[in-house]
Structure formats: structure tokens, C-alpha cells
Amino acid sequence: MIFSHGFGGTHIVGTQYAQALARQGYVVYCFDFCGGSPSSQSDGSTLEMSLFTEQEDLEAVIAMVQGLDYVDSDNLFLMGTNQGGAVSAITGAAHPQEIRGMVLLYPAFVMVDTANELFASAEEIPDSTYFLWMNVGRTYFEPLLNYDIYGAISAYERDVLILHGDADRVVPLSYSERAVEAYPSARLEVLPGAGHGFSGENAQSAIAMVLDYLAVHLQKE
């Protein structure tokens, strides 16, 4: 399982999931996106980061993980929260034969609408914008203008599990509901009362659903 953190996050976000899955015998790899946050342990500036540079980062991680002798490359799964969920979604769609399944937690498909609401054209985008809680560059917003993210993710035909709280005010539940319609085979599990980010009982419920999903979708020898 390769875990991708969200906007402004680090690999630390994946700790609770990685530990729970590792206790059940799974190999979990968490990493920092290049320029993913001011606290990133990877190289790069937040001004250079975008959905698509993060896709390149994830593709590099996939290639590296596939070369590890203790990893079963036939059972490679992607998991991501927030923007990391969106990155996982487009990356999985670009590599459908390599990725056995995906778990997307409150994936930020909203980012396309946000970019188009902020800027009517590429000419309006400044070199630096303070967005949410950090500075991002022109390269963050420009590729999202008129980007059909649902069309992109629909190329992934294997089973996808989406987990989303119905009290999420950062990424409304409706974006995951639309994703389920776009995917050929996806299931949406709604966590009542959960906001953006899972903790406590919500996190434990999410972990249980992830483990159930993996148990069903692992390719047995």
C-alpha cells in the first residue's frame, strides 16, 4: 500500500493507517511529495508543486516500491487523503494494470472547481498565491483550468473504495458521490458526522473498511 498525503501535509498523516495495516502484515510506504508543504522532507518548493508534479512523484515511488524484494508487485494498492486521494486517482487511471486497487479518503476532486472559480483564465493567475494555508505557484492552478478530472479517473476499471464524512466542509461529499458515478466500479462509504480528516472512532471505522477491502481484493497465489 502506497499512502499519499494531502495538501500541505506530510507522511505523518498516514501514520495511523500505516501502523494498523502493518500490524496485519501489509507493507505500507508513506512519503512526502516534493514541495508538498513547507515541512516536506522531500526537495522542492510549494511554488513548484501541482496535482501533476505529485503524480510524477507517486509514479517514481511506484517504480521504486516495485523493485523491493519484500513487496508483492501483483498486489500494489494506492491510498490517499484529500489532494493525495486525487493524485492517487489520476495515477491509478494512468497505470491500471499495475495498480490492483485504490482507497480514496475524502479525495479533493473539488480542486478543479476551486481553480476555475478563482481564475477565469490563465492570464489572471499570479506567480504566487496564498491558498488555504501556504503559498502555491502559477503551476498549481493553471493545469486545472478546464481539466476534466472525472473523465481522467474513469479510465480505472478495477474496484475503488471511497471513504468520506458527511460533515466535511473542505471537500463536500457531493464530489465523492460524483466520483462513484464516474468510476466503472466504485463504492462510497459515508461516515456519519465525520469532517475533513478522520480521528478516533471515525479513523477506526475507516481502518476496518480498508482492511476488509484489502482482504477481498488481494490476488492470492
Regions found by a protein language model. Give the residues of each.
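Alpha/beta-hydrolase fold nucleophile elbow
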Residues: 70-82
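Conserved alpha/beta-hydrolase
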Residues: 20-41
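Short beta-strand/loop motif that positions the catalytic acidic residue
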Residues: 156, 162-164, 168
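Catalytic histidine-centered segment of alpha/beta-hydrolase-like enzymes
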Residues: 194-205
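The serine-hydrolase catalytic nucleophile loop
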Residues: 7-19
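Short alpha-helix in the alpha/beta-hydrolase fold that links the catalytic acid
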Residues: 158, 172-181
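Hydrolase active-site cap/lid region
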Residues: 90-139
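Alpha/beta-hydrolase active-site loop
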Residues: 13, 48-68
